[in-house]
Amino acid sequence: MKHKLITVLFSLLFLGCNTQNTSDSSFDPELRLKELGIVLPETSSPVANYVNTVVSGNLLYVSGKGPLKSDGTYIEGKVGKDLTPEEAYQAARLTGINLIATIKSAIGDLRKVKRIIRVTGMVNAVPEFSEHPKVINGCSDLLVQVFGERGRHTRAAVGMGSLPSNIAVEIDLILELED
């Protein structure tokens, strides 16, 4: 009997320990953006026959975005030829800002983000370039800075022979929304 009671108590203790506590009242991505000096831009319109976002159940799918600058132009070029890895990292960071703007446009309040699940980053690079993960870290690092543990995600970072309009990177993502 004593053994069963101890087992029940430990079970309740572990059930009460949620390692991914998403009901943290201090979680405020918009405050984090402000602290980082980031002002979200207007969301860009799709450039072809698709939509920016789709909600299915509690998942939000965000279409690929690129490094769109405030003047309406993109950071363009191939990494290893036209851009350094650091310049491409900054392009991926800017793309992350554009993704966050798209998320906010779709759901209104960034506190509704329960977790970033998946990031897919495509790098426009010369064939001999092999540091794609370091480039896409520009976006991944930003997501963790803004969303904390909720921003940690699975990821693919791949090289491409070309991207639309010769943009430096294109990144899409999937996230989970609070119920």
Indicate residue ranges for each PLM-predicted region.
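Bacterial Sec-dependent N-terminal signal peptides
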Residues: 1-24
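Short, polar/acidic, helix-capping and beta-turn segments at strand->helix junctions
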Residues: 19-179
